[in-house]
Amino acid sequence: MGARNSVLRGKKADELEKIRLRPSGKKKYRLKHIVWAANELDKFGLAESLLESKEGCQKILTVLDPLVPTGSENLKSLFNTVCVIWCLHAEEKVKDTEEAKKLVQRHLGAETGTAEKMPSTSRPTAPPSGRGRNFPVQQTGGGNYIHVPLSPRTLNAWVKLVEDKKFGAEVVPGFQALSEGCTPYDINQMLNCVGDHQAAMQIIREIINDEAADWDAQHPIPGPLPAGQLRDPRGSDIAGTTSTVEEQIQWMYRPQNPVPVGNIYRRWIQIGLQKCVRMYNPTNILDVKQGPKEPFQSYVDRFYKSLRAEQTDPAVKNWMTQTLLIQNANPDCKLVLKGLGMNPTLEEMLTACQGVGGPGQKARLMAEALKEALTPPPIPFAAAQQRKVIRCWNCGKEGHSARQCRAPRRQGCWKCGKTGHVMAKCPERQAGFLGMGPWGKKPRNFPVAQAPPGLIPTAPPADPAVDLLERYMQQGREQREQRERPYKEVTEDLLHLEQGKAPHREATEDLLHLNSLFGKDQ
């Protein structure tokens, strides 16, 4: 750590903290960026001590500069950091990383005076046509075309692509890029370099034979040709089995009616490679679904990888992208994606689902679940008003019932303390709405006004009609008793006569005579 801190000291370290990472950004360089750059130098076999001087930084830049155009983000960040350190050692005032890069490229270009130290964006690139110096067919100064064999580097890249991807969806565009401008002879060399996967090679050979037969059927032989005239290619000529390299070049670049046999052969092989891709990748795009804990970005990568292997119309692929991508997402991401509206872009979907399925969302879901589990259910207002504190009838304490009480059992009634009855039948129970009940006592829940002693009530006297009515009622009761009495006595005497006893009254026969009913005139 001490050696890394010695890269910049004193004033240079203060100047480093004033340089911005981006022209319009707020973040600035810190010593941790120097430590990171020292760690990255080990990956390129460069010593950390080179950062301590201007010449050492210049050597690092010489090594990294050719790799910047095709390098990764870490490589570009390392190049930018070394540019800033070079400016500090050279005592050049810069405000941000872009100024440091321009200053370094200008100084290095002035010192070397070659195009190798020019800015990466201004370097000449290879021509896009098939006539560059890296392609098999090249044109000489006299206008003639010559054949240059494929370099071992190209063949090695093709073999490594097949071995690493194992006929994945990347093999087809890889073959298309490596075989650009090649003749059928060169393409056969590439196919012969594949040692393994002979089943896939046999599928490609069958596709080539079928396409060659179709070519022969569509292009019949016109007839005998004059001597010295180049014949038209047959299917086997396009496949490179019955033609030479010189004939293939002449067919490709003749002025009249050229036949691009190389591109035709490439197209046949691409059809075979696409069938091999479907065979080695049987996963259907309809089966690509996002897992419950899978990040949305990983699911999108798998989806587009399977979509790339699908050999369908672009309109069908567009429909799959708009429909299946959202339909096969997990419920969490699907809920977020439906809130984006109709036909959201892929950038909007990736941004919206960036945190779904991550540790942050898992923590929030767990916190919500725990909150719901630990929160007691709400008590209704009426139940809360009616809720009372439980009191024990045995010991008189609150918080438990008599059944749960641990104190000794109390004898007698728990209400009044007397023996002989239980609390449910206690005569001293609490008065109801109408009083204490039918026990011969006056109700004690109504206030009674006590008249002070020495005062005479001033209420009016009773109504005389009430007394008169009571007297009439009493007389009526007496008359009814008198009318019922003779019949009762006669009935009792007859019962005594039947039993052979003497009657209680001597006038029984008189009472039984009709004179008792109709008088003495009968």
Swiss-Prot record:
GO MF term set: RNA binding; structural molecule activity; zinc ion binding
Region Dimerization/Multimerization of capsid protein p24, annotated ranges: 280-366
Keywords: AIDS, Capsid protein, Host cell membrane, Host cytoplasm, Host endosome, Host membrane, Host nucleus, Host-virus interaction, Lipoprotein, Membrane, Metal-binding, Myristate, Phosphoprotein, Repeat, RNA-binding, Viral budding, Viral budding via the host ESCRT complexes, Viral nucleoprotein, Viral release from host cell, Virion, Zinc, Zinc-finger
Lipid-bearing positions (N-myristoyl glycine): 2
UniProt motif PTAP/PSAP motif: location: 457-460
Matching Gene3D superfamilies: 1.10.1200.30, Human Immunodeficiency Virus Type 1 Capsid Protein, Immunodeficiency lentiviruses, gag gene matrix protein p17, Single helix bin, Zinc finger, CCHC-type
Residues found modified as Phosphoserine: 151
PANTHER family named among the record's database cross-references: ENDOGENOUS RETROVIRUS GROUP K MEMBER 24 GAG POLYPROTEIN-RELATED (PTHR40389), PTHR40389:SF4
Name of the featured protein: Gag polyprotein
Gene: gag
